[in-house]
Amino acid sequence: QSTFHDDNYTNNVRLGAMSNWALILNPKNKIEFRNIFNQLATKETVIRKGELFENGLELSNQSFRYEQKSILSSQLSGTHELSEKTNLKWISGLGYTQRSEPDFRRFTSSRPMGSGEAYRIDLQQFESPTLQQAARFWSNMDEYVLTGTVNMEQILGKKNIVDEMNKVLKVGVYTEYKDRYFKARWFGIVNPNRVDASITSQKPEDFFSNDNL
């Protein structure tokens, strides 16, 4: 039997910006430039306290996580009335998405139930790390998208003042190029040499320092 209580602390910060521009060259030609940018940052800390009665242990598990997401979308387009019966519209676009999780840390720690001792971080005693005990995770993803579209409309025959009565031939082309780069690594800290409590009883910020690796 076991009991647990979780405290979850989350902080979100969001930033957004939008910019739209239009250049009207004349009544028959217009150029537009649209941009939108969003960024979201999330910081999360989870502290779990509990008792593992069958093993006679008090547990204190913690995780620290930061994630950042960015999205940029830009579009340059043009609308042109080439003649009374011919219209041309083109759109070029750029999209960028970025997601970063620079250092996700988590660990479990325990002490004998009712002892009042300092918690000791639990480590695997052999060379087989896990993602649950004293682990760190890094990931980064960048994605680029380029798009291009050209559409043309040609009214066939005599133009009717009622648009719905016109016979219209529509042709278009669309192209897209996408490139994605993703990298992820994780490390699990093990204790095959049985280091003493002076290391495993450290505070998380000290335990995860480079001096202990």
Stretches found by the model and what they are:
Residues 1-45, 72:
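Transmembrane beta-barrel wall of Gram-negative outer-membrane proteins
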Residues 115-134, 183-213:
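Flexible glycine-rich, low-complexity coil/linker segments exposed to the extracellular/periplasmic environment
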Residues 1-3, 49-60, 122-134:
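Flexible, solvent-exposed coil segments and beta strand-coil junctions
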Residues 13-19, 70-76, 92, 144-152:
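Hydrophobic, lipid-facing positions within transmembrane beta-strands of outer-membrane proteins
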Residues 1, 44-51, 101-109, 182-188:
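Outer-membrane beta-barrel translocator domains and adjoining extracellular loop/strand segments
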Residues 27-28, 83-87, 157-168, 184:
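Short loop/turn motifs that connect adjacent beta-strands in outer-membrane beta-barrel proteins
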Residues 37-41, 94-100, 140, 144-146, ...:
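Transmembrane beta-strands of outer-membrane beta-barrel pores
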Residues 19-25, 80-82, 154-156:
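Residue-level signature of outer-membrane beta-barrel architecture
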